[in-house]
């Protein structure tokens, strides 16, 4: 049935990300961060000091040949994978476990309004009904996407709630995962770039003792503080 097809698809998506993310739950594992754009590859590795402060241990940036990525990163997998190997070696990063950010252009991000539901009702609606098809107009089949959602706010008076909807094409997720694996690395975490930046800012805001913090973006096109 159609409902069974949707449930199976949802289960497959959860399995794909569950297998990757569960590997990152081991506290003793080291993980390096990777950012790949059509112009460059950036890698970094952090560590925590005894007083629970983050320390930037290793970092490296490598420019890519635009002539070789003119058709996009995904179409240049082999070249990008080799360049990623060199970037990791230049930074002297030895861990194979990595977290990778996916460009915003590879994701659909929207805030949608839905009827007010409990968490359980929302989960059931996602698994058994065409909730996202009704709330979000996608050009492709929803089964081709990996979907993340988070409730932003509930309005009991209006009997509505706002939900953050994020969808990444499974083909893009698999392509970025393939590039990382071709470089001999193990992708344990994947997230959309704008959310990785927000998480970094949120973590910096939690630092005590009122230390001044800055969020710095270094790139070939975007450089901001």
Residue ranges and their predicted role:
Residues 38, 57, 75, 79-83, ...:
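Generic alpha-helix structural propensity
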Residues 50-52, 70-79, 153-160, 204-210:
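Short, glycine- and charge-enriched coil/turn segments that flank and shape catalytic ligand pockets
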